[in-house]
């Protein structure tokens, strides 16, 4: 993983290239159709959680913190073991972890399928294999981690729906996988985009995602 200091250095040197890639990243994903299959929730249903991975967790966390119905979004690691759930180890790309975000949401206000629609439209590019933007490695892979059979059913059905509709010009590489556990990332990673809005990495890679969310999903933006 490219560390924070390295990221800043790269984006200072290649500012114009980063600006171009930022606009490309924010505009590349089409607005996707709603999922034909979704979860159900009775009035007064308890809060639920979803875990997704797709590139650096800073930007995905920031996106979902701007979505109505989301109670919290937490950066962390999923796919590996507790022993390797540490930034310096995960960043080596030698663990089974992916940088992930756990989303706690109110299912009476937003559905699991709607969260996936946001994730696949503005959260990241689901056609990028083991990378997102300037970040490369298996720890940046695109994954929907499911907690139960209903989440698995919704995720697999939605990806199949998008493939059949040829919603993207390239094949979708997002995997659907069971969630063994979610491990919260170090404190300095939490709310990084909100706390460091002028960080060049945030400015050129993550802030445009929030703008895209506001433009394409005004009914969900807060």
Language-model features: where?
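N-terminal export leaders
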Residues: 6-11
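Flexible coil/turn and secondary-structure edge motifs
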Residues: 2-5, 17, 21-222
């Amino acid at each position: 993983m490219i560390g924070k200091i390295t990221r800043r250095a790269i984006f200072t040197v290649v500012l114009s290239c980063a600006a171009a890639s930022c606009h490309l990243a924010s505009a590349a994903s089409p607005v996707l159709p709603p999922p034909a299959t979704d979860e159900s929730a009775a009035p007064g249903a308890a809060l639920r959680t979803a875990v997704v991975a797709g590139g650096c967790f800073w930007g995905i966390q920031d996106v979902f913190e701007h979505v109505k119905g989301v109670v919290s979004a937490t950066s962390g690691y999923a796919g590996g073991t507790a022993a390797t759930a540490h930034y310096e180890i995960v960043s080596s790309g030698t663990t089974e972890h992916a940088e992930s975000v756990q989303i706690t949401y109110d299912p009476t206000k937003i559905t699991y399928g709607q969260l996936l629609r946001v994730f696949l439209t503005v959260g990241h590019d689901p056609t990028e294999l083991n990378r997102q933007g300037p970040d490369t490695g298996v720890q940046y892979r695109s994954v929907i981690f499911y907690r139960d059979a209903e989440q698995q059913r919704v995720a697999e059905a939605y990806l199949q729906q998008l493939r059949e509709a040829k919603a993207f010009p390239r094949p979708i590489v997002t995997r659907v996988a069971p969630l063994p556990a979610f491990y919260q990332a170090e404190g300095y990673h939490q709310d990084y985009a909100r706390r460091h809005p002028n960080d060049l990495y945030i400015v050129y890679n993550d802030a445009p995602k929030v703008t895209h969310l506001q433009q394409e999903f005004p009914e969900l933006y807060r």
